């Protein structure tokens, strides 16, 4: 006689779990879809011209300039539209460093740590391959490099730090701005031990968001230089790093 009550209780539990799952999914989608969009300057940087060929695929965007030897695989920051980094990455390509900008699941690099492997399958062979990224993207790029150091000639971190220990013979470039209000400086300092071969460049007046072109970011400091100046300084630091 108690069988129907047990079945009814089981149905209620099942329905409760289903409702919870739907609510959690809705919250997750709301979180991931509330992201920073590439602005007009970034969109304009996606055009192909005599200086760089820009092509898009399921995995990301390729910036192919006159260089043929060096490639940077770039992971975008969390909840940032990947094409927001087009101005900086295009500038690098025009100056000899081709760049593959990875398209991340839900715009969160934590869900695409191994995307570099797919990028390497898609592009031509290069003599030197580097991996890097901005903020969360930089941290996840460093994680990939820690697991596959033999694939990389260096790591480039923009307002980011490595939570994994990197080999002593793997050079790392760290670039951040003095006005960055998002980068956790305490965590940054704590994790310096993970990057024994470190070159650090501090951009005076630069902030967190101006590595890309997506407007102001919550919690960030106010930049004292314009984005173009920060891109120039960043490109200069990266290209100098490659020479050494």
Label the model's feature ranges:
Residues 88, 183-194:
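Short alpha-helix in the alpha/beta-hydrolase fold that links the catalytic acid
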């Amino acid at each position: 006689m108690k069988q129907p009550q047990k079945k009814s209780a089981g149905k209620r539990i099942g329905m409760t779990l289903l409702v919870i799952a739907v609510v959690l999914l809705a919250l997750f989608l709301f979180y991931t879809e509330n992201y920073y969009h590439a602005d007009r300057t970034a969109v304009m940087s996606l055009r192909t011209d005599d200086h760089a060929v820009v092509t898009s695929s399921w995995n990301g965007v390729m910036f192919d300039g006159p260089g043929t030897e060096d490639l940077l695989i770039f992971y975008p920051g969390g909840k940032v539209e990947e094409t927001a980094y087009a101005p900086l990455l295009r500038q690098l390509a025009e100056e000899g460093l081709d760049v593959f900008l990875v398209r991340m699941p839900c715009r969160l690099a934590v869900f695409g740590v191994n995307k570099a492997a797919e990028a390497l399958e898609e592009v031509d062979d290069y003599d030197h391959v580097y991996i890097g990224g901005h903020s969360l993207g930089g941290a996840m790029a460093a994680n990939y490099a820690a697991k596959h150091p033999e694939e990389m000639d260096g790591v480039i971190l923009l307002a980011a730090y490595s939570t994994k220990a990197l080999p002593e013979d793997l050079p790392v470039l760290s670039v951040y701005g003095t006005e960055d209000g998002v980068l956790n400086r305490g965590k940054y300092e704590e994790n310096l031990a993970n990057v024994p071969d470190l070159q650090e460049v501090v951009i005076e007046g630069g902030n967190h968001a101006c590595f890309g072109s997506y407007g102001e970011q919550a919690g960030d400091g106010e930049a004292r230089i314009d984005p173009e100046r920060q891109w120039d300084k960043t490109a200069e630091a990266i290209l100098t790093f490659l020479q050494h």
